[in-house]
């Protein structure tokens, strides 16, 4: 809707929405939006799209068949998901203190949300006749980040992804742990 609105502010609004979605709380500032509701103006602060959905394709209630006919989509569409993370978190000892326990709990919660979103998107693509393709960091990558936004770690991760793409990455066609035999 934003892109099709014809508004001269549409491009900047899309950029702001994407910036807000990537604004990790406490790491990046929230993005302020001026909004109007029932004739009254408000300021809204938006942060981290992952707080509501880690991965998103389209609303689950969308009638893809009807939409694809309207858009005259030819052939079977492809969805490509690139997950910047390892699926399985390794066991980790945690200090018996509130903050470390809370941080590990949040990490576990995020991992569950990512997997749940991958399953939801997979099931939607199967229902709607769309090819599902997933890439993620292999478990063989065992480097550890020493701090948030660790440049050395990010360079190693980039080099791994570059080499995997160069070698001809084989996309996963189902989410990790999904039993296609139990449909």
Label each PLM-derived region with a short phrase:
Residues 1-183:
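Patatin-like phospholipase
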């Amino acid at each position: 809707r934003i892109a099709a609105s014809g508004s001269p502010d549409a491009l900047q609004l899309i950029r702001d929405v994407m910036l807000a979605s990537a604004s990790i709380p406490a790491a990046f500032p929230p993005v302020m939006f001026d909004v109007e509701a029932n004739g009254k103006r408000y300021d809204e602060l938006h942060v981290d799209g992952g707080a509501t959905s880690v991965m998103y394709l389209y609303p689950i209630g969308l009638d893809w068949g009807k939409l694809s006919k309207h858009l005259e989509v030819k052939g079977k569409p492809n969805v490509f998901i690139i997950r910047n993370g390892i699926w399985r978190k390794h066991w980790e000892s945690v200090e018996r203190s509130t903050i470390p326990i809370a941080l590990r709990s949040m990490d576990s919660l995020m991992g569950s949300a990512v997997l749940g979103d991958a399953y939801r998107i997979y099931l939607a693509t199967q229902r709607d006749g769309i090819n599902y393709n997933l890439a993620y960091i292999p478990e063989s990558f065992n480097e550890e980040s020493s701090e948030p936004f660790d440049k050395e770690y990010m360079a190693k991760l980039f080099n791994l992804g570059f080499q995997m793409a160069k070698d001809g990455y084989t996309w996963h066609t189902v989410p990790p742990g999904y039993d296609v035999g139990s449909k």
